């Protein structure tokens, strides 16, 4: 993309309404614009990151054997009355009456709707286990929306629901989701710690929240410092293996890590003092096992092996996709702007032309742009007639991990400058070497990269 043709309304000054870093930088970088309190328009740069996160979530869900679908934002109030939860959400639920006088609501979650779908189409234990999920916009009427997309009223969320014949099968689904979520967050450059938590109005017997440590987090958390040393990395996990999923679950949850709602001071004090930590955390996901809490009152049963009807065991699993962007920025920024992890950056590399209009510099930038595009990367070429300082400031603000700087002086020596946004370190390379270096950096994140042929055309959702 050429910046002269892109819509990137960056702000030079810090917006007065922004209280935390992620909100301030998302507004300044032209990622979002507030439509009303807690509701945002996603501008091209922000939407591009949102789409990348969504695709990572889809890829990891499908890898775990989960099936994508899509449910509506508007739901019937009757389903919520049937489950007994219609009044539990209080004023956070946006209630609507249509022209026929039917009570409806803008869904804050989807347990009732998915249970209704299940009971209408699944009747035998032979159709289990089953895990369905979707990514959809939600609405919760927060009394004080703040912190930008971190605590908005409208947000994009992944909901997954498993249906199993037995508690043991449902707990395997719980562990499978935990593994899948950890891998998802690691691909996004985040360390999200699973912590024992409270189930809230969703209910259930077992639940873990995934929290990213950050000073601006809304939750107080208590943990053993050794928990931050654990990584899943490139380990291959068989999601059908009960033992493998349980082993990962135990590895990541055996050390003390809890939110303030479930914190046990006596147990915490048994940890060696030098390893005890308390901090703030941003919740980016949660998994639940709630047994037959919804299936029994709503009649979601299957015919068991003995021919008798039995209520299915269920679980619910959510990732706050739009909130993740705020969490990533809170965890990865400096005083100049955002520093995107390579797995989620909106563009893979920036190209800065120090002397727009110079024939040699223009040609070199065009060649770099074409070469990077041909191997499947997305460069952002700043071809505006702006001062070099302004171009560098824009690149630093929007946080692309790598920048190639092209100028007449370097080209006389046959080199361009490749700069890391994270470290600020620069190296002079030939244009061909710079392209190869960037391609090598992104190869682990993009196995489809080609050194010879352009990337094939892609659909809007790469998971389709």
Swiss-Prot record:
Q: Name one GO biological process term.
A: prolyl-tRNA aminoacylation
Q: Which reaction does it catalyse?
A: tRNA(Pro) + L-proline + ATP = L-prolyl-tRNA(Pro) + AMP + diphosphate
Asked if the record carries the keyword Glycosyltransferase, the reply is no
Q: What keywords does the record list, in alphabetical order?
A: Aminoacyl-tRNA synthetase, ATP-binding, Cytoplasm, Ligase, Nucleotide-binding, Protein biosynthesis
Q: Enzyme group, top EC level?
A: ligase
Q: By its UniProt entry, which Pfam families does this protein fall under? A: HGTP_anticodon, tRNA-synt_2b
What CDD domains would the database entry show?
ProRS_anticodon_short (cd00861), ProRS_core_prok (cd00779)
In short, the EC number is: 6.1.1.15
Q: Does the keyword RNA-binding apply?
A: no
Q: What GO cellular component entries does it have?
A: cytosol
Q: Which terms does the record give in the GO molecular function aspect?
A: ATP binding; proline-tRNA ligase activity
Location in the cell: Cytoplasm
Chief location bin: cytoplasm
What InterPro entries does this protein's entry cite? aa-tRNA-synt_IIb (IPR002314), aa-tRNA-synth_II (IPR006195), aa-tRNA-synth_II/BPL/LPL (IPR045864), Anticodon-bd (IPR004154), Anticodon-bd_dom_sf (IPR036621), Pro-tRNA-ligase_IIa (IPR002316), Pro-tRNA-synth_IIa_bac-type (IPR004500), Pro-tRNA_synthetase (IPR050062)
Specify the superkingdom.
Bacteria
Query: Per its database record, what is this protein's job?
Result: Catalyzes the attachment of proline to tRNA(Pro) in a two-step reaction: proline is first activated by ATP to form Pro-AMP and then transferred to the acceptor end of tRNA(Pro).
- Which protein family is named in the record? Belongs to the class-II aminoacyl-tRNA synthetase family. ProS type 2 subfamily.
Q: How is the quaternary structure described?
A: Homodimer.
Q: What is this protein called?
A: Proline--tRNA ligase
Source organism of the structure: Ruegeria pomeroyi (strain ATCC 700808 / DSM 15171 / DSS-3)
- Which taxonomic lineage does the organism of this UniProt entry have? Bacteria, Pseudomonadati, Pseudomonadota, Alphaproteobacteria, Rhodobacterales
Instruction: Supply the gene name.
Output: proS
């Amino acid at each position: 993309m050429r910046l002269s043709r892109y819509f990137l309304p960056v702000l030079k000054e810090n917006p007065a309404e922004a209280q935390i870093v992620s909100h301030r930088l998302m507004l300044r970088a032209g990622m979002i614009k507030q439509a009303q309190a807690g509701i945002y328009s996603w501008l091209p740069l922000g939407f591009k990151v949102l789409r990348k996160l969504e695709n990572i979530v889809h890829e990891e869900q499908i890898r775990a054997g989960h099936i994508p679908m899509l449910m509506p934002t508007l739901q019937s109030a009757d389903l919520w009355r049937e489950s007994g939860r219609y009044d539990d959400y209080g004023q956070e639920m946006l209630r609507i009456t249509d022209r026929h006088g039917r009570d409806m609501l803008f869904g804050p979650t989807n347990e009732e709707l998915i249970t209704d779908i299940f009971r209408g189409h699944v009747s035998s234990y032979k159709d289990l286990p089953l895990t369905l999920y979707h990514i959809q916009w939600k609405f919760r009427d927060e009394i004080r929306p703040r912190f930008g997309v971190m605590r908005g009223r409208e947000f994009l969320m992944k909901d997954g629901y498993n249906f199993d014949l037995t508690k043991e099968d449902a707990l395997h689904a719980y562990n499978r989701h935990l593994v899948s979520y950890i891998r998802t967050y690691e691909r996004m450059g985040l360390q999200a710690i699973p912590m024992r938590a409270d189930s809230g109005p969703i209910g259930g017997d077992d639940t873990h929240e995934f929290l990213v440590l950050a000073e601006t987090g809304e939750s107080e958390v208590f943990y053993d410092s050794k928990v931050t040393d654990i990584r899943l990395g490139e380990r291959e996990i068989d999601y059908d293996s009960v033992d493998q999923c349980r082993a990962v679950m135990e590895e990541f949850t055996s050390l003390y890590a809890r939110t303030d709602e479930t914190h046990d001071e006596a147990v915490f004090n048994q940890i060696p003092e030098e390893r005890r930590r308390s901090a703030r955390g941003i919740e980016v996901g949660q998994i639940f096992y709630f047994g037959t809490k919804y299936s029994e009152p709503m009649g979601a049963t299957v015919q068991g092996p003995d021919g008798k009807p039995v209520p299915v065991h269920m679980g619910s699993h959510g990732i706050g996709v739009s909130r993740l962007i705020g969490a990533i920025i809170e965890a990865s920024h400096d005083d100049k702007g955002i520093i995107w992890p390579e797995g989620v950056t909106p563009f893979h590399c920036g190209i800065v032309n120090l002397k727009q209009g110079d024939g040699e510099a223009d040609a070199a930038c065009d060649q770099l742009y074409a070469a990077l595009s041909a191997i499947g990367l997305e460069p952002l070429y700043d071809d505006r007639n702006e001062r070099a300082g302004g171009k560098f400031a824009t690149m630093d603000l929007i946080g692309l991990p790598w920048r190639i700087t092209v100028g007449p002086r370097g080209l006389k020596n046959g080199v361009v400058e490749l700069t890391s946004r994270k470290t600020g370190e620069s190296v002079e390379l030939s244009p061909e070497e710079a392209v190869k270096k960037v391609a090598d950096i992104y190869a682990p994140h993009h196995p489809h990269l080609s050194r010879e042929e352009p990337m094939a055309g892609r659909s809007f959702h790469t998971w389709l």
